[in-house]
Amino acid sequence: VRVCLVSHRLGGFDGVSVAAAAWVRGFRALGWTVTRAAGFFADHEPDDVVVRGLWADRPGAAPPPVDHATISRLCRTHDLLVLDNAGSLWSAPLASRALEHHALAAGVPTVVRHHDPAWQGVVLRPVEGDVVPLHHPRHLHVVINRYTESEFAARWPELLDAKALVVRHPEVDVDGLATGDRDACRTALGVDPDEVLLAHPARVDAANKNIPGAVSFARALAAVLPGRVRYWLTDPQPGEPGPVADALAQAPGLIRGWVPRPADLYAAADVVLLPSTWEGWGLPVVEAAAAGKPVVAGPYPVLAEIRALGVTVWDPEDVGGVAALLSDPDAHRAVLAANRAAVVASLSQADLPAALADLAERARELTGTVQ
C-alpha cells in the first residue's frame, strides 16, 4: 500500500509534526510505503516531496501559487492520501481546496486529520465560502478530541450520516519516552542535581501557550520550595518586545533552547508546564505522564478529556499541591505510576498500526474502492 501523508510542515518539534511522524511510523510498521509531502520540511527523507502553495516563503506572507501538477500526481500515484491538518487551517486555503479537488478527481481514499480547525485559532487568511476545514463526506475526517467532534457534527451533520467522522486521540511512544538521559541533559543545560527544573515546551510567538502564566507559576513555586527553581522555555527565539519578553525577564533561572530527543527533555525535567489557553490536545501533557513526570496544565477546554482518561494534571493555581508532591516521594511515585498506566491503557502508539489499517479501510469504503 502506497501512502502519501501531506501537511503544511513536517519534521519539526510542533505537535502536528510529532503526531504526523507517529502516523508515518505506524503505516511503515504495517509494511506500507509512505511518501511525505509538505510545504516545508524541518528534517529530510530521500523521497520527500515539496508542495508549493502549502507554506509561505516568508513569515507573514501569503503562500505562493498552488502546485496543482504535483498535487494531482501525488493523488494519482498513491493508494491512500492522508491530509494531516493540511485541510484544517486558514493558512493555505487554496492548497487545501486543491488537495480535496484532486483527491476526489483521482478517486483516492482520503483520511483528513483535523488538529486545529480554522475557527479555533487566529484567522490567518480570508476564506470565502464553506471551504476550510475540508468536510467532504466521501473523505474520512479524523478529529483528535470530542470537543471538535461535536463542533464538526453541528456544522456538517452529513458527515455523521455518511459515517465519515471519527475521533482518534493522538498516541505517544510510551516506551521511547522512558529512555531519556536525565544526567546528561541536565549537565548540558547547566542544571545542578538539586535544582528543580520546570520545562515548558512552547513557541515564544504562540500566544495560546501563555508564557507569562508559566513564568508566574515558576515564580510562585520558587517562593515556597527550599531549593532553586529554574524555568526552561524550549524555544530559543528571542521574540518581540511585549508581555512575553517582560515575563521572561522575570523568570527564575531562565534556560532557553531545544534538545533533540523529547525523551531527554522529560527525563531532565522535574515538572512539565503547559498552562495554555487553548490546545487541540496538548501532547506534552500525555508525554509527560508517559515519562513519569508531573504536569501543570490548563485551563484549556480539551484538557478535561485527558483527565477523563485517568491522567492527573495539576492546575496552575495549585502551587501548594505541586510543592507538596515534590516533597513527598511516596505520593510522587504512586500518582505518576497511575498516570503512566492510564497512558498505556488508552494512548499508547503500540495500538496505532492496527488503528491506521482500520482508518484506511473506512476511507476506502467511503470512496467506493474497498479492497
Where are these predicted regions, by residue range?
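A short, active-site helix/loop in glycosyltransferases that binds the activated sugar's phosphate group
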Residues: G121-A164, V172-G176
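Conserved donor-binding/catalytic core segment of Leloir-type glycosyltransferases
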Residues: L5, V191-K209, V215, R219
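Nucleotide-activated donor-binding/catalytic signature segment of Leloir-type glycosyltransferases, i.e.
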Residues: D235, P241-P260
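A charged, aromatic-enriched C-terminal amphipathic alpha-helix characteristic of glycosyltransferases
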Residues: E317, D330-A363
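A short helix/loop element that forms part of the nucleotide-sugar donor recognition site in Leloir-type
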Residues: V127-D130, L177-V191
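Short hydrophobic beta-strand element within catalytic cores of glycosyltransferases
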Residues: V285, P294-G298, V313
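Aromatic "clamp/platform" in nucleotide-sugar-dependent glycosyltransferases that forms part
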Residues: T277
